Regions:
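Beta-propeller domains
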Residues: 1-320
């Protein structure tokens, strides 16, 4: 593991945001010892920016994911908190959900560099976010710039953090809209009541206005991984199509763009499916949500989440 010359002393984020225009990696990570959040930018493997951001104490338990837009880097400050002192109490955990702590978003202007200060945008609700869908900027009818953030939000969470298990509460898909100048919450709406999580998008649209999100159905699975995937239109706010995994369970339907694709949904969804008996690699047409191929693997693969796709050019660059 690379600590980048000792600058990164804590954990690195599970979900760096890669700017599709520059290839730079933007990451937010939680430093549990200090309670701070670190924001780092890597360009071609070199650390080009690093900043530590103090949090209210007790600190947010996790910053597992964040947002990147054309001009902003955004991280959530969440109602799931971390307090090591809690773990010394009988049957207690260092993690606890504080419904009195309102969720907010820390917004940094990317162009300000080392002079950037965090602006806090209040979400007007308590909540916890594991994974984000996307964020972008829009100009409203009056010419004001709005910051749009979309993510599944949990409004409760047990202290034993039972992620990917039947004890995990349900998340609901929310869209937040803020005035970027004032930080005021313009609109907040729940798009889906059904439990969808671990979203996927065409990352060529990361930070841009995104129409399509691919959401893992965790309600139909009884909380054990995902039972299928939903294609959802974020602009019309309507479900388009879904694909059911049947007796299998999946971890994340990863979007892979087709070569020379023009349209946002021109590509594939790749999913690793597992049952009690075997495992299979599933390939769906992301435009039609129909099955293209299914390859039964020679050995059952245990349940897992998250993955990445490397094309032949990227693989060759790693081998160079």
């Amino acid at each position: 593991f690379d600590g980048l010359g000792g600058v990164l002393t804590g954990p690195f984020t599970a979900h760096p945001k890669i700017d599709p225009d520059t290839g730079d990696w933007h990451s937010f990570s939680t430093e549990l010892k200090s309670g701070s959040v670190s924001y780092s930018v890597l360009s071609k493997g070199e650390l080009t920016f690093y900043q530590e951001i103090d949090q209210a104490k007790p600190s947010s338990a996790f910053v597992h994911d964040g947002f990147l837009t054309d001009h902003c880097a955004v991280f959530p400050d969440l109602s799931l908190r971390f307090d090591a002192g809690q773990s010394f109490k009988e049957h207690a955990s260092a993690f606890y959900y504080d419904s009195d702590y309102m969720m907010r978003f820390g917004v940094l202007h990317r162009q300000e560099g080392s002079d950037a200060t965090v602006r806090w945008f209040d979400a007007d609700m308590h909540g916890h976010i594991w994974h984000t869908v996307n964020g972008w900027e829009e100009v409203d009818a009056d010419g004001a710039t709005e910051l749009v953030l979309v993510a599944p939000v949990f409004t409760s969470y047990p202290s034993n953090v039972p992620i990917h298990s039947p004890q995990e509460p349900h998340a609901h898909l929310y869209k937040f809209r803020f005035n970027l100048d004032s930080g005021a919450l313009v609109d907040k709406r729940c798009l889906l009541q059904h439990f969808y999580e671990r979203p996927s998008i065409n990352t060529d649209w990361l930070g841009k206005q995104t129409r399509y999100a691919y959401l893992l159905d965790e309600e139909g699975s009884g909380g054990i991984m995902g039972s299928g995937v939903l294609k959802y239109d974020l602009l019309s706010e309507q479900a388009i199509a879904s694909f059911d995994y049947g007796e299998y369970r999946g971890g994340e339907a990863l979007f892979v763009p087709r070569d020379n694709a023009v349209e946002e949904d021109d590509g594939y969804l790749i999913e690793l499916l597992t049952s009690d008996k075997d495992s299979a690699l599933l390939v769906l047409d992301a435009k039609t949500m129909t099955e293209i191929a299914r390859l039964t693997l020679p050995q059952r693969v245990p349940y897992g989440v998250h993955g990445c796709w490397l094309n032949s050019e990227q693989l060759q660059s790693l081998q160079a």
